[in-house]
Amino acid sequence: LRIIAGPCQHESLEHSMKIARECKRVCDKHGIDYIFKASFDKANRTSINGERGVGADVTMSDFQVLKNELKVNLLTDVHSVEQIEWVEKIVDVIQIPAFLCRQTDLIQAACKTDCVVNIKKGQFLAPWDVKGILSKTEGAKAVWITERGTSFGYNTLVVDFTGIQHMLDTYNVPIVFDVTHSVQRPGGNGTSSGGNRRYVPGLARAASAMGVTDFFLEVHPVPDMAPSDGPNMLHLDDFERVVDDIVRYSYSR
């Protein structure tokens, strides 16, 4: 099992340290490979007033402290080719956002680094069209594909478990299930995205039972006070229960 978990965006060293320490404790209990995630810039905002984050310089400096003190691997996302050089010496995994999953130059540049490349599958993309994304990843150290829900009308996402099964059976790369973004309601709150975190535990159990072994969860001590993605983020206090269930329902393929 592998779990990627952390806040939507990096807020401060103290904040990320608290989250990373608790997530690592829970994952270590089960012998799960843990990766801390956080964004330095949330470029894809519903509104011009949406909070973007503290920036690359502060985030990468704090990430180095996290890595040194907690001995955790790190993931962050990039939105342009030039951002890759800002992060590649610090993080272990470079993430391509879902809305940029077809951007050839961005994918190929990320694949030239020594980092693993995690590509979020766009909400608009069919599972069988992932082969086009993978055709752009030659030379990568490793590639992961992350499922984060499928568009189902306005402001609505659904989880297509048959699509996840197709990707597990078809592609020779890890398929990560992003549980918390799958319960998002994009733009659903007018000037920000909505969501419903109460669906997270059930979706995590279902994915584990069907053979998913890689999970992505955004967590926060006080999600309703988070600068972004609060409605779909998991309470940090609930993280252990969800991970316990993932282990309990795990199906060995």
Model feature map: region roles:
Residues L1-R2, H30-Y34, N68-L74, I90-D92, ...:
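Short, well-ordered coil/turn segments that N-cap beta-strands
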Residues D114-V219:
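Catalytic alpha/beta core domains of metabolic enzymes, predominantly
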Residues Q9, A98-L100, V200-N232:
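Glycine-rich phosphate-binding active-site loops on the catalytic face of alpha/beta enzymes
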Residues I4-K18, T46-V54, V72-D77, I96-A98, ...:
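Active-site mouth loops of central-metabolism enzymes
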Residues E22-R25, K29-H30, N49-L75, A109-V116, ...:
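Alpha-helix-loop-beta-strand connector modules within alpha/beta enzyme cores
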Residues I32-S39, N73-V78, F177-V179, T213-V222:
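Short beta-strand segments at enzyme active-site cores
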